[in-house]
Amino acid sequence: MKKFLTYTLLGVLLAGCAGSGREPLETVVDKALAGAERQTLLMAEKYSAREGRLPRTWENGEDVSSDSRWWCSGFFPGVLWYVYENGRNPRVLEYARMFTARVEREKHTTDNHDVGFMLYCSFGNGLRLTGDKSYEEVLLTGARSLATRFKPEVGLIRSWDHNRDKWQYPVIIDNMMNLEMLFWASKHTGDPVYRDVA
């Protein structure tokens, strides 16, 4: 009798989970993307009046911002470009351009390897989605800046200059995220030097 009851309950449970009320995957994805767009717009609206600031994290119930020097500064503009790519909302495009512009000064960064993902997440996606030629100059200047971190004797791009008393030539896996911009620069200019650095 125990086995019968166990199998009956298991059968009822499985029948209840059969999925007859499940939404198609496409619907679930569309809802998730619509929610992401709403949340991204809320963040962009909140930060639009904070000149030069970019969202960074949430700590102790408060949002924390950064300027463009933070190593992840290109990520939020990149998110805006991806959200724009999905829905083609003109408001998202406006914010993507605004927050991308906030990162432009990093094209001259030569003291760390982060310039690749500061710029390629933002300006790279902006160029890909809009064809805005002004973004090319930013990316090329950034690629030249990043290439200054390469040391031919070592064959690598140095990650940082700090802690020289601990590290001779620090290189971390994040460097891989910078290579795409260098490959783009070689393809765009026909100059193999960027590819060779990568």
Feature map (PLM): residue ranges:
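Glycan-recognition and catalytic cores of secretory/periplasmic carbohydrate-active enzymes
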Residues: 21-198
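Sec-dependent N-terminal signal peptides
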Residues: 4-14
